C-alpha cells in the first residue's frame, strides 16, 4: 500500500454505518414528525414497523414494544399521526430510519406539539428566566388593559378596579383575542402602549376557552413582544387551569382577569394582595424551574437511552425480526417449489398407475356399453315399426278381417274347407267359423 493511502482514514462499511448512526442519534436529538402511515407491520416480537409519508417523501420507522404499549389506539394504514422520534440508522442495510417514542392522531396533538416546541425554544433563549422579569409598581398611576372591548374579561377587570380603587386611571387598548389576526393585533397593542408610555403596568388577557380559542397567546410574536416590553405585563389568560406561552414570558401570571385587577389595585387588603403577588412569582419561578428540570431530564434521558443496553437490544431485535421474516419467506418459497415438484411427480405416477389404466378401461367400457344400449334401443324401435307395418299388411289379407266384415268360413269335421255344396251330403256335420266363435250344423238337404 502506498504512503498516500496509508495516511488516509479508510472506513469499512460497518464502521461507516456505525459512525453515521451515532452522528444522527447524538446530533439531531428529538424531532416531531407528522405524516401518513403505510406498510404497517406488527410481528410477534411486539415491535412495530411502518413508513411515514407525505405527498413528496417517505421515511422508514420503528417503534419498539416498550414505547408502543403506551399508544392508546391501533395504528392503521392511511392514518395521519403526529410522532415524537429520534433519528437513527439501521446498520446492516445502511437504511436511514427514525425510532418512534410516542404517537398520537394528528389534530389536537399538532397544537400541543407546537406549544412544546416553542416553549422549549424560548426557554433555551432565556425568555422565561426570573432574572429578566420586571417587578410590578407598588402604586401604579395608570393601568393599561389589552383585551377585547366586548369580552367578559374587560367587564371583570373594570368591575374589580372600580370596587377596589375607583380613582385609578385606566387606558383600554382594544384588540381581537381569538382568530388568525388576533396575535398580530395583540403584539401591536403592546407596542402601542410602550410607545405612548402612559401606563405603569399592562394587563394582557381574555376569558377562558379551548386550546384553539386561546392559541393567539401561544404565538411567538406575542411572546417576543411581551418579553421586549419596557412596561411590566401581567398575563391573565383564561382560567387558572389554562396555561399559555404568554404566561411564561410575562412578568407576572394571574390565574384570571379578575385576579390581575386585584394585583394592580391597592386597598386595605394590601398585604393580602402582596402575598398573592409573591405566590404568583413563586409559582412562576417553580414552573420555570420545573420546565428547566424537565428539559434537562429529557436530555439526560435521551443520552441514557442511547447508551443503555436496551437500545442495542432493540437494534438487534429489529435485525432478528428482519432475518426471521427473510427466513420465513425463503421457507415458504422452498415449500412452494417442493409442492410443485410433488404435484408433477404425483401426476406422472397417476398417469402410469394400473389403477389409472383400470379406471380408463372402465370408463371406455362404460362408454361402449352406453353405445351398445343405444344401438339396441334404436334396433328395437325400428323392429317394432317394421312389425307394425307387417301387421297392417297381414291384417289386410287375413281371413279374420273378412270374418270381421260379416263373412264366415265353413269346414267339415275333418277340417276340410267347404267351397262348394257338392262337397257335402245330407247328414254331414259342418263347422262354421264366425268372427267371435264356431257353429256346428247338420246338412238336411242340398
From Swiss-Prot:
Its main location: cytoplasm. GO terms for biological process: DNA catabolic process. Its EC number is 3.1.11.6. One of its GO terms (cellular component) is cytoplasm. Keywords: Cytoplasm, Exonuclease, Hydrolase, Nuclease. It is found in: Cytoplasm. GO terms for molecular function: exodeoxyribonuclease VII activity; nucleic acid binding. InterPro entries: Exonuc_VII_L, Exonuc_VII_lsu_C, OB-fold_nuc-bd_dom. The keyword Nuclease applies. It catalyses: Exonucleolytic cleavage in either 5'- to 3'- or 3'- to 5'-direction to yield nucleoside 5'-phosphates. It holds the Pfam family Exonuc_VII_L. It comes from the Bacteria. Belongs to the XseA family. Bidirectionally degrades single-stranded DNA into large acid-insoluble oligonucleotides, which are then degraded further into small acid-soluble oligonucleotides. Heterooligomer composed of large and small subunits. This is Exodeoxyribonuclease 7 large subunit. It comes from Vibrio cholerae serotype O1 (strain ATCC 39541 / Classical Ogawa 395 / O395). The lineage of its organism: Bacteria, Pseudomonadati, Pseudomonadota, Gammaproteobacteria, Vibrionales.
